[in-house]
């Protein structure tokens, strides 16, 4: 028997789940648009969909913020219907051989900084900045970076007085240890500076391929956190950023000069990276590393299929759903997350010169290359809490361990 959510979304197959609830694909019964639906039992001990829905409503309209289509009670369950998005940056990082080029990192950094600035402008901290929580769009928005998973978000200004929350110490670690700021490790209340420091670690992770505090052995989570904290604090910025442009070290130095309640100069940080981008002679054409890989594969497949009709060995982005579990947010303050899960461009579509000398528009490249359309939409709070940090993967893609991911639908691109 077909199940209709909110009177207009026909529930499809399950694409993720865990202790927090389950994620399904769904299709609008009139427009046939495909969306993502997060469902949780309304009697769960720690319900969070209502909180997430309210927060998304607050952020609604911002570039790179998923839209809520419907929220309400369906029988005995709460349901949140949202945009379906593409693969996470962690998925794409793995797909590209666990390293991004400086050009790709800088193009991503510009959008990621803008997303964080927007969330801060609405009075909230994200508090779980990591590659898994940035997803690419689909279709015509395949170039746009989205920020998701606000399950640990917190107001840093009082809604009535607009005063900044007070400085506190002895706080539990909230977020993901690998990317947490030094002050977060030390138990200091998080502020805007901490989201930005976490972003810095994400960017270095992309450039380096790993961070010095990954893979540390420990007997329990506390010891693991302590070791990560010790290694992170004892690693000089210049060592962390060695062999990479000085702008990345400057980024960290700036973050460390910010006081607890100081408003960051987001424009300064974006100019820092934009000036580097220009100096290196890059073109902001939204052609990322994964775009090139998929294009090269499509060319190879095309030549092979011409030699052997019907043959194809193109691989899609591998998506491991065996680890796509979720976790219940115990509370904003008590939650300790120790896991790490592996654009709308304006102006004319950039061109890629093909081997035969003709040009292929960016949108056409995505179409011809079967650019992976992951079902990684994570309505807020779907990231995996309390999963071992070196093993979990990102998002809610559809796939298996042995085969590449294949899109079961056409990218909505609405």
Swiss-Prot record:
Post-translational modification, as annotated: Autophosphorylated.
Supply the enzyme class, top level.
transferase
E.C. number: 2.7.11.1
Tell me the GO BP annotations in alphabetical order. blue light signaling pathway; photomorphogenesis; protein autophosphorylation; response to blue light
Is the keyword Methyltransferase in the record? no
Q: Which UniProt keywords apply?
A: ATP-binding, Cytoplasm, Kinase, Nucleotide-binding, Nucleus, Phosphoprotein, Serine/threonine-protein kinase, Transferase
Residue positions of the active site = 128
Tissues of expression: Expressed in seedlings, stems, leaves and flowers.
| Polar residues composition-biased segments | 302-325, 346-356, 370-395, 403-414
One cellular component (GO) term of this entry: nucleus
State a single Pfam family of this protein: Pkinase
Catalytic reaction(s) noted: L-seryl-[protein] + ATP = O-phospho-L-seryl-[protein] + ADP + H(+); L-threonyl-[protein] + ATP = O-phospho-L-threonyl-[protein] + ADP + H(+)
Task: List, alphabetically, the PROSITE patterns matched.
Answer: PROTEIN_KINASE_ATP, PROTEIN_KINASE_DOM, PROTEIN_KINASE_ST
* Role summary: Protein kinase involved in blue light responses (e.g. hypocotyl elongation and flowering) by phosphorylating CRY2 to reduce its stability.
**PANTHER family assigned:** CASEIN KINASE-RELATED (PTHR11909)
Family, according to the entry, reads as follows: Belongs to the protein kinase superfamily. CK1 Ser/Thr protein kinase family. Casein kinase I subfamily.
- Protein's name according to its UniProt entry: Casein kinase 1-like protein 4
Task: Name the species this protein comes from.
Answer: Arabidopsis thaliana (Mouse-ear cress)
């Amino acid at each position: 028997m077909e199940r209709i959510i909110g009177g207009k979304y026909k529930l499809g197959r399950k694409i993720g789940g865990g202790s927090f609830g389950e994620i399904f694909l769904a299709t609008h019964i009139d427009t046939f648009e495909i969306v993502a639906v997060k469902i949780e039992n309304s009697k769960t001990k720690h319900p969070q969909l209502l909180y997430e829905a309210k927060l998304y409503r607050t952020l609604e309209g911002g570039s790179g913020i998923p839209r809520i289509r419907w929220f309400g009670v369906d029988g005995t369950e709460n349901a949140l219907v949202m945009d379906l998005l593409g693969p996470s940056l962690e998925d794409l990082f793995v797909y590209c051989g666990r390293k991004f080029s400086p050009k790709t990192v800088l193009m991503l950094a510009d959008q990621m900084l803008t997303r964080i600035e927007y969330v801060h402008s609405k009075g909230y901290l994200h508090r779980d900045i990591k590659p898994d929580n940035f997803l690419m769009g689909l279709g015509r928005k395949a170039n746009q970076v989205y920020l998701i998973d606000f399950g640990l978000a917190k107001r840093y200004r009082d809604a009535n007085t607009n005063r900044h929350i007070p400085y506190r110490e002895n706080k539990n670690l909230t977020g993901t240890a690998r990317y947490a700021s030094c002050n977060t490790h030390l138990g200091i209340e998080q502020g805007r500076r901490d989201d930005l420091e976490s972003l810095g670690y994400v960017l270095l992770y992309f450039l380096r391929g790993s961070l010095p505090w990954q893979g540390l052995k420990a007997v329990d989570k506390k010891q693991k956190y302590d070791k990560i904290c010790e290694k992170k604090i004892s690693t000089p910025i210049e060592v962390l950023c060695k062999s990479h442009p000085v702008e990345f070290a400057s980024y960290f130095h700036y973050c460390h000069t910010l006081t607890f309640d100081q408003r960051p100069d987001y424009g300064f940080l974006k100019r820092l990276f934009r000036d580097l981008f220009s100096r290196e002679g890059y073109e902001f054409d939204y052609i990322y590393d994964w775009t090139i890989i998929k294009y090269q594969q499509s060319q190879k497949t095309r030549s092979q299929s011409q030699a052997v009709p019907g043959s194809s060995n193109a691989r899609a982005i591998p998506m491991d759903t065996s680890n796509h579990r979720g976790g219940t947010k115990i509370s904003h303050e008590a939650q300790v997350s120790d896991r790490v899960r592996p654009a709308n461009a304006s102006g004319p579509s950039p061109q890629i010169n093909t081997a035969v000398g003709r040009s292929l528009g960016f949108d056409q490249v995505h179409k011809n290359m079967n650019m992976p359309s992951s079902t990684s939409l994570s309505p807020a709070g779907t990231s995996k809490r309390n999963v071992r940090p070196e093993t979990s993967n990102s998002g809610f893609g559809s796939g298996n361990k042995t085969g590449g991911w294949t899109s079961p639908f056409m990218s909505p691109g609405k």
